[in-house]
Amino acid sequence: MDTIKKLYDYGFDNHKYQKFMGIPKTIDNDLPVTDHCPGYGSAAKYIATSMTEIIADNDSFGATDPKLCVVEIMGRNAGWLTAASVLSDDSDCDGPDLVYCPEVPFDMNKYVSSVQNLLKEKKSIVIAASEGLRTADGKLVCEQAHDYEFIDAFGHRQLSGCGRVLANTIAKETGYKTRCIEFSILQRCATHLASRVDVDEAYNAGFIACEEAIKNNSGKMVTLQVREREPYICEYQTADVHMIANIEKKMPLHWITRDGSYVSKEFVNYVSPLVVGSLTPYYAGGLPKHMNRKYRNGHKVDVVTI
């Protein structure tokens, strides 16, 4: 929302009359004021679904081939996406064994001890870990991977390697077979697993932003406010973009267990309504088709290639 804030401030200071409305859209779900952000529900749905499938695969080897799998999930400073992995805990799956979010300092010794205790009870272990885990002294766990460091235009360090560090540490300490899986960009582009609630709310947020601009409102962001979670009722409001830009909303600490290795039932109640419903993609040749942005006669057009 920083761009909307800057555009609005520039227009106001220079007596320009364009209208600037913000529409939240981040799978990170880390914007303040709004209950949640469009995009998050679909990403959470993908993460929980994939986690269920990974756990089923890991369990299929049984005691004959014990192994540990660490799933690295996006989340620089906020654990909303990683926490969504617990939705896989259902009648057909026990969910991840450990869940580590960046809001709580990561302790490698406690982590190793927790895994060793789990290994006394089971031979198949799956762990969800945020890419942005930091130790108590503020150091990124992923830095121990010694990967090439890329800095983006905003000065953000590309985070990758946390999962490998956690998996390799257990392999070294126990001799067990370990594996690291990074969802990376898959968690934000898997439209075949989009949440119906999420898609509807994204559309509504855009529609309301346009309505507000037509009413001469500007410098605001559409917010989603959940009035009821059971049954689910979401309302749309607007808030001053200055209350939102450059402010990060993290997971409430009381939604994370005291030892920092799992999340609470309160979080499950929060996220569950956001992943409800599905969409049927358009298929051709057995594969889902996607809309592409292409140029025709110098203009961008939306094209579905069949």
Model-derived features with residue positions:
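Mobile beta-alpha loop/short-helix "lid" or hinge segments that flank ligand
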Residues: G22-T26, I185
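C-terminal non-catalytic interaction/assembly regions of soluble proteins
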Residues: E143-I306
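Glycine-rich, charge-decorated loop segments at or immediately adjacent to ligand/cofactor-binding or catalytic sites
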Residues: D28-H36
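Flexible loop/turn segments at secondary-structure boundaries
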Residues: M1-T3, N29-D30, N77-G79, T135-D137, ...
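Short glycine-enriched, charge-decorated loop/helix-capping segments at active-site entrances
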Residues: D35-P38, S195-R196
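Accessory alpha-helical/coil subdomains and C-terminal extensions
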Residues: M1-G11, Y17-M21, C37-R179
